[in-house]
Regions:
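Acidic, serine/threonine- and proline-rich intrinsically disordered appendage/tail regions
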Residues: 392-472, 483-484
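Short, hydrophobic/aromatic-enriched beta-strand segments in well-ordered soluble domains
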Residues: 277-281, 299-302, 328, 383-393
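Short aromatic-acidic-glycine turn motif
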Residues: 333-342, 351-353
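Extended, low-complexity intrinsically disordered regions enriched in serine/proline/glycine/threonine
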Residues: 1-292
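Extracellular adhesion/glycan-binding regions together with long Ser/Thr-
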Residues: 350-390
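Short beta-strand elements of extracellular/lumenal beta-sandwich folds
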Residues: 303-332
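Short, hydrophobic/aromatic beta-strand segments
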Residues: 322-328, 338-342, 400
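Beta-strand-rich interaction surfaces with strong enrichment in secreted/lumenal proteins
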Residues: 300-301, 315-316, 372-377
């Protein structure tokens, strides 16, 4: 992950990418979140990811209140980003774009949080390849010539079980009154490798085995270049030895949220030669139970034939005593004509009612259906949200080129406020005080299509999850709220 900032009132592009800075400046963008992902994150197997992203392309942005035409700025933004990252974002138009009312709240400071300034779209069919990776790496201060970015070889990355590239841009206040603010750009890549299959049943791994090479140099422009290895389970579910020895060991947190981290200062280690961080396990792979997430959602299409069908969202609240208030956002393509009167919300034999319903019907070839529900999920129970639809007749030119894929449907987005942080996720470094200066708010996202939890120093977090059905429902998600 790389993070660098640009003062809002100063055109300083020594580290901040000039091309991206010009795009957000010309289009009056206050906040931007973009991800390009290949594969699906298996949350029940891998826990919660550090940076959530659904398959395909996923984009949402907040615009300044003085923007003359948000719709025009959004179109110009998607076209510019399409050229910037060699992606098909130019296919983002009114038929896949919505302005959510209660979802996707700004993560940073914005002058106005009016939902009319927000635009959200997803292209679950978008494929990711080296044409996207190369321009993404060029946005880094040292490109792929030095530092951690030298590990990003396309051959190794695209053979991973999961690969995601992300750009997150937001405005950060430097004082309480926000007189001084900066633009913060966070670039992250998320990868999942199956080391057990690659190493004949052993979990043993190293940088050279995963990425094809070690690290020879650090980026001279970076103020800090560090590798963190979570060793919390070392000795409990399997014993392994790290080599070389870490620069520092940190233990923080309490109870179920206690974490142990091995910290490697890249600048220190590369001065002594090439760094090939490795973990050598004593025994073959050991399987253990993964705790259930506090909220879990699955989503699928039901019915048969080519005329009618339905979409079912099954939301599981695993809290044994507390009900949870959530916001469910669902964007349905215009070619699926939704019958709102068929909407059913149930938990076991009980029929539930939504606290708030916001629905904008779609128009053929003009806009999608936009449904937002505020729900109270009973404790230790599964809540089912289902509705029916009718497929529209399409022109022969409107069918996708590959009939084997069929039509993709963007995933639902589930938002909730949790009282406590969750133990079962991959991205927990908020418990380590020495890391808070590096990342003050930690993201850990989870879901059948994606779930987000934001953890501040206090035990509060925003939990967001999206789910989807491959071949019937594509996978996309995302919303963040800032914790005080």
């Amino acid at each position: 992950m790389h993070r660098f900032t640009l003062p809002c009132a100063v055109q300083h592009f020594r580290l901040f990418p000039l091309s991206l800075g010009e795009i957000v400046s010309q289009q009056r963008v206050q906040e931007l979140h973009l991800s390009l992902t290949q594969g699906r994150w298996q949350h029940l197997k891998w826990g919660y990811p550090f940076q959530e992203a659904p398959p395909g392309a996923h984009l949402w942005a907040w615009f300044a209140p003085d923007t003359l035409s948000v719709s025009s700025a959004w179109k110009n933004l998607t076209n510019a980003l399409s050229g910037q990252l060699c992606a098909s974002l130019n296919f983002v138009d009114d038929t896949v774009t919505v302005s959510p009312k209660r979802s996707f709240q700004p993560q940073g400071w914005v002058r106005s949080a009016n939902s009319s300034l927000l635009r959200y779209a997803a292209l679950p069919r978008e494929s990711v390849c080296t044409e996207n990776l190369t321009p993404w790496k060029k946005l880094l201060p040292c490109s792929s010539k030095a530092g951690l970015a030298t590990l990003l070889h396309a051959l190794q990355l695209f053979t991973a079980n999961y690969m995601s590239l992300a750009l997150d841009l937001k405005t950060v206040c430097q004082d309480e009154d926000c007189v001084h603010a900066t633009l913060e750009l966070q670039m992250s890549v998320s990868l999942v490798f199956d080391t057990v299959a690659a190493q004949n049943g052993y979990q043993t791994w190293s940088l050279s085995k995963l990425f094809g090479a070690g690290i020879k140099t650090s980026c001279p422009l970076s103020s800090m270049s560090t590798i963190y290895v979570d060793i919390s389970n070392n000795g409990s579910v399997g014993t392994y030895r790290l080599s070389p020895e870490p620069t520092q060991l940190v233990v923080s947190g309490e109870g179920a949220h206690k974490r142990s981290l091995a910290i490697y200062d890249l600048k220190h280690h590369v001065a002594q030669g090439r760094l090939n961080l490795a973990a050598q396990y004593e025994k073959p792979h050991i399987f253990w139970l993964i705790p259930e997430p506090p909220l879990h959602i699955t989503r699928y299409i039901q019915g048969y034939g080519l005329e009618r069908g339905g979409i079912v969202n099954r939301i599981q609240n695993n809290n044994p005593t507390k009900a949870v208030r959530v916001v469910l956002l669902d964007i349905i393509p215009w070619f699926l004509r939704v019958y709102l009167h068929t909407l059913k919300i149930s938990s076991g034999p009980r029929q539930l009612k939504a606290e708030h319903v916001s629905y904008q019907p779609g128009r053929d070839r003009e806009r999608p259906h936009h449904l937002e529900l505020t729900l109270i999920l009973p404790p230790a129970a599964e809540t089912i949200v289902a509705y029916e639809f009718e497929r529209a007749f399409l022109k022969w030119t409107e069918y996708p080129p590959d009939a084997n894929h069929g039509f993709y449907i963007g995933s639902a987005v589930l938002s909730a406020l949790l009282d406590e942080p969750v133990a079962n996720y991959s991205g927990d470094i908020s418990v380590c005080p020495s890391l808070r200066h590096w990342l003050t708010i930690v993201e850990a996202k989870k879901g059948s299509g994606g779930l987000l939890q934001r953890l501040a120093s206090k035990a509060k977090g925003l939990f967001r999850k999206s789910s989807s059905e491959s071949s019937g429902c594509g996978d996309s998600s995302d919303q963040d709220k800032k914790n005080k």
